[in-house]
């Protein structure tokens, strides 16, 4: 088991209820834009501006956030809430931790991400009547809630402008022992196909651009809906199968780094006996400690890179699991 990063694992505020009746899931973001055109280094914390919103209902200044809609994952909700509250589209990056606090219904749990604005215009609405873009120090003063300020401090603690590599374990595909044909051709089952469809919005929230899959039908099928959405081909990767990894893990590592070094945000879909070893090796190499670990079918590792170096590794459960 890889060590846990204390910075990310500890909730920003603790639930003080003895027994929660219900957990309300929500997601939010530090929405940022580059202000380097005014003089500075692109993506440096000192030259970015972050969005702080005013909600007339509460008369407060806070970060964009909101509850999940039915069937949504936290990353999808974060991207949607950003657009609804600020008018901006955005690409998610590093996960910044979670806030939990008691509410009358039980407990509210909010996961936050860094989110780079890709454009848009704010229009006042019933939920948000003002938006200001501020340097980090000024935003820290503007935010009213201590938890929001803690999230913002986490945002600037590590590189702001990052590239993302998305490593996906293929969706469910029945049991190997029950499949009579060539296991390389074993397809996704009904749940696996649903996972593949649900992964589209989640992977697009992180700006997925290029697609790679281990040489297995189920790996290709897992990202086929995304390939159709992006109108992209899926590159076949023989070096990233379980058998190839067991035979030559160094070749698989080299291939992973080659893909990560290419332009864009790649999605790499592979198998359950490949992912843990690759993630652990890269994290140890970069001295990155993931907040949580996992390897469920349909799950995703969101790997954040800055100047080619791994700076964050976030595990996301399958989209059909809470």
Swiss-Prot record:
Extent of motif Nudix box: 66-87
Key word DNA repair present: yes
Domain Nudix hydrolase: 22-156
Needed cofactors: Mg(2+)
Binding of substrate, residues: 55-58, 60, 65-67, 101, 108, 127, 145
Domain observations: Contains an N-terminal Nudix hydrolase domain, followed by a linker region and a C-terminal histidine phosphatase domain. The C-terminal domain is necessary for efficient catalysis by the Nudix hydrolase domain.
Family: Belongs to the Nudix hydrolase family.
Function, in words: Catalyzes the conversion of 8-oxo-dGTP to 8-oxo-dGDP, and 8-oxo-GTP to 8-oxo-GDP. At high enzyme concentrations, can also catalyze the conversion of 8-oxo-dGDP to 8-oxo-dGMP, and 8-oxo-GDP to 8-oxo-GMP. In addition, catalyzes the hydrolysis of the diadenosine polyphosphates diadenosine hexaphosphate (Ap6A), diadenosine pentaphosphate (Ap5A) and diadenosine tetraphosphate (Ap4A).
Protein name: 8-oxo-(d)GTP phosphatase
Source organism: Mycolicibacterium smegmatis (strain ATCC 700084 / mc(2)155)
Native organism taxonomy: Bacteria, Bacillati, Actinomycetota, Actinomycetes, Mycobacteriales
């Amino acid at each position: 088991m890889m060590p846990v990063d204390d910075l990310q694992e500890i909730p920003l505020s603790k639930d003080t209820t003895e027994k929660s009746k219900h957990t309300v899931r929500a997601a939010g973001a530090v929405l940022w834009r580059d202000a380097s055109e005014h003089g500075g280094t692109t993506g440096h914390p000192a030259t970015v501006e972050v969005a702080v919103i005013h909600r007339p209902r509460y008369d407060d200044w806070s970060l964009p956030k909101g509850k999940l809609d039915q069937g949504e994952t936290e990353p999808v909700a974060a991207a949607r809430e950003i657009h609804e509250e600020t008018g901006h589209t955005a690409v998610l990056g590093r996960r910044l931790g979670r806030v939990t606090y008691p509410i009358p219904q039980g407990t509210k749990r909010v996961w936050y991400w860094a989110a780079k604005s890709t454009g848009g215009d704010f229009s006042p609405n019933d939920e948000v009547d003002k938006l200001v873009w501020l340097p980090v120090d000024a935003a820290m003063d503007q935010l009213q809630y201590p938890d929001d300020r803690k999230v913002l401090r986490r945002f600037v603690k590590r590189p702001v402008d990052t590239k993302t590599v998305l490593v996906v374990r293929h969706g469910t595909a029945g049991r190997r022992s029950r499949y009579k044909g060539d296991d390389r051709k074993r397809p996704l089952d009904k749940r696996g196909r649903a996972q593949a469809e649900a992964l589209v919005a989640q992977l697009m929230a992180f700006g997925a651009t290029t697609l790679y899959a281990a040489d297995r039908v189920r790996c290709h099928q897992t990202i086929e809906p995304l390939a159709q959405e992006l109108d992209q081909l899926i590159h076949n990767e023989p070096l990233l199968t379980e058998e190839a990894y067991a035979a030559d893990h160094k070749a698989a590592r080299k291939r992973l780094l080659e893909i990560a070094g290419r332009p864009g945000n790649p999605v790499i879909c592979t198998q359950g006996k490949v992912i843990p070893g690759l993630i652990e090796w890269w994290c140890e190499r970069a001295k990155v400690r993931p907040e949580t670990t996992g390897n469920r079918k349909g799950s995703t590792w969101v790997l954040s890179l800055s100047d080619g170096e791994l700076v964050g590794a976030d595990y996301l459960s399958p989209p059909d699991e809470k």
